[in-house]
């Protein structure tokens, strides 16, 4: 596709190699995960609009079908950035010192917006969270930085 640079096409091909089966593409159920692996942040509604499914094995998305989806999602303006997430978490920062209660962050992730399940929150905290202090507070800016950093590729 003309508007996807060669390097990004290579990244997409790598994601397909990891997530899909040769010649068949990826399961449409995994569309959101594939886009997130490429540093995009699509909403569940956008994933569904782009052809994602709620059940496995309903349909496959081939590479040539995925590239226009990737390109369109990349142009989407409704993606949050670091500053947006920090502003949101400042609402929980009662002392205005860059910290919030871990329990409040956990509740927000489990119950608000496009909520996560318990296992997803546990994995997220294991990957991105500093230990809470004695009073249950965590520095939220470091959490957001780690959450939004580029994924680590192991050779």
Curated annotation (Swiss-Prot):
SUPFAM superfamilies: EF-hand. GO terms for biological process: mesoderm development. PROSITE patterns: EF_HAND_2. One of its GO terms (molecular function) is calcium ion binding. The keyword NADP does not apply. Keywords: Motor protein, Muscle protein, Myosin, Repeat. The keyword DNA-binding does not apply. Residues 7-41, 80-115 form the EF-hand domain. Gene3D superfamilies: EF-hand. GO terms for cellular component: muscle myosin complex. It comes from the Eukaryota. PANTHER family: MYOSIN LIGHT CHAIN 1, 3, MYOSIN LIGHT CHAIN ALKALI. Myosin is a hexamer of 2 heavy chains and 4 light chains. This is Myosin light chain alkali. It comes from Drosophila virilis (Fruit fly).
């Amino acid at each position: 596709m003309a508007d996807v640079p060669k390097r990004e096409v290579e990244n997409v091909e790598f994601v397909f190699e990891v997530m899909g089966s040769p010649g068949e593409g990826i399961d449409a159920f995994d569309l959101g995960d594939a886009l997130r692996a490429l540093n995009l942040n699509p909403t569940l509604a956008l994933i569904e609009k782009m052809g994602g499914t709620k059940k496995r094995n309903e349909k496959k998305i081939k590479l040539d079908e995925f590239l226009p989806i990737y390109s369109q999602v990349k142009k989407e303006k409704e993606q949050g950035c670091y500053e947006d997430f920090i502003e949101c978490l400042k609402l929980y920062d009662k002392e205005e010192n860059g910290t919030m209660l871990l329990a409040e962050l956990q509740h927000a992730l489990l119950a608000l917006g496009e909520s996560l399940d318990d296992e997803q929150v546990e994995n997220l905290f294991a990957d991105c969270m500093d230990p809470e202090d004695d009073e249950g507070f965590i520095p939220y800016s470091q959490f957001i930085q780690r959450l939004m950093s580029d994924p680590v590729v192991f050779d």
